[in-house]
Amino acid sequence: GTTCYCGKTIGIYWFGTKTCPSNRGYTGSCGYFLGICCYPVD
């Protein structure tokens, strides 16, 4: 996936969704251009 930043935290950018995939163990997220940025990077 594409990397993105929530402040200084690196995450993975998911296009076209407002929620992170629940089976990947993400602990946080932030809104991002036309999608969401989910972290930590898996």
Swiss-Prot record:
Keyword tags: Antibiotic, Antimicrobial, Disulfide bond, Ion channel impairing toxin, Nematocyst, Neurotoxin, Potassium channel impairing toxin, Secreted, Toxin, Voltage-gated potassium channel impairing toxin, Voltage-gated sodium channel impairing toxin
GO biological process: defense response to bacterium
Disulfide bond positions: C4-C37, C6-C30, C20-C38
UniProt xrefs under InterPro entries: BDS_K_chnl_tox (IPR012414), Myo_ane_neurotoxin_sf (IPR023355)
Gene3D superfamilies: Anthopleurin-A
GO cellular component, one term: extracellular region
GO terms, molecular function: ion channel inhibitor activity; potassium channel regulator activity; sodium channel regulator activity; toxin activity
Domain of life: Eukaryota
Compartment(s) of residence: Secreted; Nematocyst
Additional detail: Negative results: does not block Kv11.2/KCNH6/ERG2, Kv1.1/KCNA1, Kv1.2/KCNA2, Kv1.3/KCNA3, Kv1.5/KCNA5, Kv1.6/KCNA6, Kv2.1/KCNB1, Kv3.4/KCNC4, Kv4.2/KCND2, Kv7.1/KCNQ1, Kv7.2/KCNQ2, Kv7.3/KCNQ3, Kv10.1/EAG1/KCNH1 and Kv12.3/ELK1/KCNH4. Weakly inhibits Kv1.4 KCNA4 (27%). Does not inhibit Nav1.7/SCN9A and insect DmNav1 and BgNav1.
Family: Belongs to the sea anemone type 3 (BDS) potassium channel toxin family.
Functional note: Peptide with both antimicrobial and neurotoxin activities. This toxin acts both on ERG potassium channels and sodium channels. It potently and reversibly inhibits human Kv11.1/KCNH2/ERG1 (IC(50)=34 nM), rat Kv11.1/KCNH2/ERG1 and Kv11.3/KCNH7/ERG3 voltage-gated potassium channels in a similar potency. It acts as a gating-modifier toxin that shifts the voltage-dependence of ERG activation in the positive direction and suppresses its current amplitudes elicited by strong depolarizing pulses.
Notes on the domains: Has the CSbeta/beta fold, which comprises anti-parallel beta-sheets stabilized by three or four disulfide bonds.
Protein name: Kappa-actitoxin-Ael2a
